[in-house]
């Protein structure tokens, strides 16, 4: 999971809208889903450019936003296309490439990005959705 800490003056909702726009318009992602609470999930594109960010993982998910006095904190994760593809390599690939995407496009909005240290815990959360943050 990626924990993205925004600069204090950055509005998290506007930031999420910018990410949506950039992923859909510039990266060719498709299948935008917005759930009842405003979270969103993207289906990765079939082309190389879209797929390169996620390898075998097919979905990017914004899981939660926390508002703190030092700036909003957003949590991102992935939902693999097949549970057998839940490997440390897939998560490492996601962390590396999605972090690069965020920093290359939105460095001026971001204070810090923290990568989940416990990949096994993240895999457990995906396999057991009731353990997700915010649930």
Model regions: which residues?
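Short, low-complexity, polar/charged sequence segments that are solvent-exposed and flexible
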Residues: 23-27, 61, 94-99
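Ampiphathic alpha-helical segments that act as solvent-exposed interaction surfaces
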Residues: 19, 80-114
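Negatively charged, low-complexity tracts enriched in Asp/Glu with abundant Ser/Thr
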Residues: 1-49
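Short secondary-structure junctions
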Residues: 27-34, 53-56, 105-109
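Intrinsically disordered, low-complexity regulatory segments enriched in Ser/Thr/Pro
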Residues: 57-92
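Short, highly charged C-terminal tails/helix-capping segments
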Residues: 107-135
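A structural detector for beta-sheet-dominated domains
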Residues: 5-9, 43-45, 79, 104, ...
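Compact, well-ordered interaction domains used in eukaryotic information-processing assemblies
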Residues: 46-61
